[in-house]
Amino acid sequence: MTSFPHPSTSESGPDPDSEPNREEQAHAYCLRLLTARARTRAELSGKLTQRGYDEPVVARVLDRLVEVGLVDDEDFAEQWVRSRHLYAGKGKRALAAELRRKGVDDEVISSSLADIDAGAERDRAERLVRDRLRREKLDDEPGSDLKVKRRMAGMLARRGYSQSMALDVVTVELAGERERRRV
């Protein structure tokens, strides 16, 4: 029996830096990222670029993922808005800023935010303030209402609600909470 030398690692398979192989590596990396949570095309593009993948490889991989429906910025934006509005209590401005940071197109952002009407946004703000006011110590000292109003309006502003809505909601809810505590 004749013995052949062991093949060297360079002869054992395709070149790991070859274009098709790099594309498969990039595809596998994207799939790993997508198992954790949905991501936008821009987020995946940034991650691949960070890893040193060339632009043509990135474009082909992302086009493939979009084609099979694994990457859909419109669906991502709608789910993000629904989730962050409902569970985190974010207002339209904060949601728009978050989606912009994630690389979602402005048209997609405005269409996904159209699902939130002003009444629903106000209801969510009222609920947030009401819940927070129940835990708040309300003094009868002069000026204490101003401190509470500032704190509550600041909380709503950080969550992306407009200043006028925040002040209106806080004023109404604070009066309601004071009345509730008197009874």
From Swiss-Prot:
Presence of the UniProt keyword Repeat in the record: no
Top-level division of the source organism's lineage: Bacteria
Keywords linked to the UniProt accession: Cytoplasm
GO cellular component, one term: cytoplasm
Residue ranges, annotated region (Disordered): 1-26
Annotated compartments: Cytoplasm
Biased composition (Polar residues): 1-12
Biological process (GO), any one: regulation of DNA repair
Described function: Modulates RecA activity.
Record-stated family: Belongs to the RecX family.
Protein name: Regulatory protein RecX
Biological classification of the source: Bacteria, Bacillati, Actinomycetota, Actinomycetes, Mycobacteriales
